[in-house]
Each structure stands twice: as structure tokens, then as C-alpha cells.
A protein has these predicted regions:
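HKD-type phospholipase D/PLD-like phosphodiesterase module
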Residues: 1, 5, 12-142
Length: 145
């Protein structure tokens, strides 16, 4: 259980049971006094603006969007006016606890990644790491935010 910090970064975060459950875990940790930093690629946050704003309003939670869209409700317009944005993505997927342990892999956050829904299960792998690699992962959170 996190005592000091959670650094969380994902490419896709679905608004489904798994996504909402993990949001509630982050909120519970922040309410215990844990500093939470959440970094998401804005390309995959459709429908999450309200919950992300609520989370960001918590004094212990910082929400950052990588490559944020100027037009929140008309994202397609953002692609038309700035085509370079299409390939400028942040594919990081990690969950780091207290700067001591991290889970890094190919799995995003959503029912299809955890076998929790009716959708087919994506076959992705994650690894848990401790040691110097954790500091490198935390650095990437800072660089991309």
C-alpha cells in the first residue's frame, strides 16, 4: 500500500468498471495523504473530462494530459488543424509506488485488459520491478507531463 506517492501513466484509460475502480483507488490513496500524479495521453480520455477535473481538484492529486487537445468536445477538429498531433503519442504504461516499486508493461486500463468485461481479453504483459529502473520510470513521468 502506498504511503508517500503514486506515479501513474497510461496511454488508454477506459471509462468502464476497471477504469472507475482504479480512479477510486487513486482517490482513496490521496485521501490518506499519498501524493498522486496521473499522466494520460489525451488522445484516449474521451468522456473522462469531468472525472479528471474532479480528481485534479483534490489537493493531493495532479492530473496531466500529454499532448492535450485545444477543443475538448471536438477532438477531430484538433486533428484537422494540427495533423502532427496524430502521431505524437505517449504510450507509457506504469504504476509506481513510493518510488520503490513499479509495474511496467503493455497493458492499459480497461476491462478488456483485465478480463473484466464481455470484450475479448487483450494479451499484454506487465512486469513488476524494483531498483534503479524505478527511478528511470519516475523520470519519464516528469519529462512527459
Amino acid at each position: 500500500m502506498a504511503e508517500r506517492s503514486l506515479d501513474v501513466q497510461y496511454y488508454i484509460w477506459e471509462d468502464d468498471m476497471s477504469g472507475r475502480l482504479l480512479f477510486s483507488v487513486l482517490l482513496a490513496a490521496a485521501s490518506r495523504g499519498v501524493r498522486v500524479r496521473l499522466l494520460l495521453d489525451d488522445n484516449n480520455t474521451q468522456g473522462l473530462d469531468e472525472i479528471l477535473s474532479l480528481l485534479d481538484a483534490h489537493p493531493n492529486i495532479s492530473v496531466r494530459l500529454f499532448n492535450p487537445f485545444s477543443f475538448r468536445s471536438l477532438r477531430a477538429l484538433g486533428y484537422l488543424t494540427d495533423f502532427a498531433r496524430l502521431n505524437r503519442r505517449m504510450h507509457n504504461k506504469s504504476f509506481t509506488v513510493d518510488g520503490e516499486a513499479t509495474i511496467i508493461g503493455g497493458r492499459n486500463v480497461g476491462d478488456a485488459y483485465f478480463g473484466a468485461g464481455e470484450e475479448p481479453l487483450f494479451s499484454d504483459l506487465d512486469v513488476m520491478a524494483v531498483g534503479p529502473v524505478v527511478k528511470e520510470d519516475r523520470k519519464s513521468t516528469r519529462l512527459n507531463s
